[in-house]
Every structure is written in structure tokens, then in C-alpha cells.
């Protein structure tokens, strides 16, 4: 069994070296890391090449032209032979963001928990396990020890109908077994997917099982370039967020609410067609 990690970078030079060091320093040593750069204009690919030169477990690739979005880049590389092979039925799969920082035991703990899930449900069942994370500032100062509690999320809400309207699975927190990855490779994530992690959670809920490891296993860095950041949750703020009511005017509220629900409906319709 090998753990296969996919890290897609774009303009990541500020934090990429720290994240690579955290992955290379994992207590679980049996892994392969595919680092794909999205035609970054900065030093991201040079950092990736240096990692590949010093560590045989790392493969560095670079797109000639930018993909246009982080989600599209990730989904394209899912099917890359350097990441997924249909023959390697015992492998596990993880994603990494370029600006996170893994705790030394992240991989070991998630592998152990996934093995326990496979013993319980069987390795042929599509399985996804996700963990908690620590929210930190750009310089690594702790903002919250638990992302789940900071956002007032409930990982127990793992049924398909619940995840359809509110995702609580973060891409960098996931580990997936081969059965789930085989489904994702066979049925590409559509353009209408809200985010790749949301779609993957829906697939796991519909066709397999989702587990949660209640332990923060990496640092989720908040800075100006985050695609999606962590914001403190609460009953009122959560209601406003779900309804898109964070605009300053009624028109903005209506537009945001309409756009949010259209995206969810389109994703649900796409899933039905699949």
C-alpha cells in the first residue's frame, strides 16, 4: 500500500517550501507526491523541481498553459498515471493545498483510520475519511484549534441529502481508498460542481461511506490569496451564509442568494444525470 498525494500549485512560492518540508517529514514514509504547477509566473515550479531532485518520492510536473481554476487543475491531475493507477488497488489518495502545513503524524493517523474503515466496510466499498484542522494566520499564529468548531460545522451530517446543501468535507483533510478514486476517475467531475471536494463528498455519500477523525492534523493558513477561507461561524452568521445574505443592499442579498442556490441546484442536477 502506498499513499499517493496530489498537490497543485499556482503562485505558491510564499508557502510551498514549508508545506513540502512538512510532507517530506511525515512519520509515515511510504508515499508518493505528485506536484503539478499551473504555469505559475513565480518560483513555484523551481521549488517543485528542487523537491523532486532531493526526494525520489516527489514528481514535479508543469502545465504549459494555466488551467483557469484550482478545481479544474486538481480534477485534471486525478487521472494522471503518476497519481492514479487502476492496478494499485491497495493505494490511498490524498490532496494537499500549497499553503497548508501538515502535522508530522497526519498521514500515519489517516492511513491507520482508513485501514480501520476498510476492515469494517470492506476495501471494495468507496470510502472517504476526513480530519479536523487548525486555523492559522499567514505567519502561522493560531486563530482556532479546530476548524470544525470554529465554523460551527457538524461532521455527523454525512448523508447525501445533507451534504447536497452544505458541504463539511475539506479537500486537504481527505483520504480516499482506491474504490472511491476509481469512481472519480471513471466519472469525471463536471464543470457544474461547486468545488471538487464537495463533489467528491457527494459521491462518497451516495455510493460508499464517510468517516471523520476528530483531530486537527494540519494547519489551514488564512491569507489574502485563499480560494476559500475560514470564517467564524455562529447561528446567525451561518443562516446568512446559507441564504447569501451578506451583501449590503437588498439587491446584493438577492443576487448572492440566487447565485448560491443556482450553483447547488446545477450540481444536484448534474449528479442526477451521472
Cite the ranges covered by each PLM segment.
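Helix N-terminus capping/helix-initiation residues
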Residues: 159, 273-274
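Catalytic core of nucleotide-sugar-dependent glycosyltransferases
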Residues: 153-154, 220-225, 229-273
Amino acid at each position: 500500500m502506498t499513499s499517493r498525494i496530489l498537490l497543485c500549485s499556482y503562485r505558491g512560492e510564499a508557502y510551498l517550501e514549508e508545506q513540502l518540508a512538512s510532507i517530506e517529514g511525515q512519520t509515515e514514509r511510504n508515499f508518493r507526491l505528485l506536484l503539478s504547477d499551473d504555469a505559475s509566473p513565480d518560483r513555484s515550479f523551481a521549488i517543485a523541481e528542487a523537491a523532486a531532485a532531493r526526494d525520489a518520492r516527489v514528481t514535479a510536473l508543469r502545465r504549459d498553459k494555466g488551467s483557469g481554476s484550482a478545481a479544474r487543475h486538481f480534477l485534471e491531475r486525478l487521472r494522471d498515471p503518476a497519481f492514479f493507477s487502476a492496478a494499485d488497488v491497495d493505494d490511498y489518495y490524498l490532496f494537499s493545498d500549497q499553503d497548508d502545513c501538515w502535522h508530522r503524524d497526519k498521514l500515519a493517523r489517516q492511513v491507520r483510520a482508513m485501514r480501520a474503515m476498510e476492515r469494517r466496510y470492506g476495501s471494495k466499498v468507496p470510502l472517504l475519511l476526513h480530519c479536523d484542522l487548525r486555523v492559522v494566520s499567514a505567519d502561522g499564529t493560531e486563530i482556532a484549534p479546530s476548524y470544525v468548531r470554529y465554523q460551527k460545522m457538524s461532521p455527523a451530517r454525512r448523508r447525501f441529502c445533507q451534504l447536497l446543501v452544505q458541504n463539511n468535507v475539506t479537500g486537504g483533510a481527505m483520504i480516499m481508498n482506491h474504490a472511491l478514486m476509481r469512481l472519480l476517475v471513471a466519472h469525471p467531475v463536471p464543470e457544474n460542481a461547486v468545488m471538487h471536494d464537495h463533489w467528491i463528498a457527494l459521491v462518497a455519500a451516495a455510493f460508499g461511506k464517510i468517516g471523520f477523525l476528530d483531530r486537527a492534523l494540519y494547519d489551514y493558513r488564512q491569507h489574502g490569496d485563499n480560494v476559500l477561507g475560514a470564517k467564524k461561524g455562529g447561528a446567525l452568521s451561518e443562516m446568512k451564509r446559507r441564504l447569501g445574505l451578506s451583501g449590503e443592499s437588498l439587491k446584493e442579498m438577492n443576487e448572492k442568494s440566487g447565485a448560491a442556490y443556482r450553483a447547488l441546484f446545477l450540481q444536484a442536477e448534474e449528479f442526477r444525470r451521472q
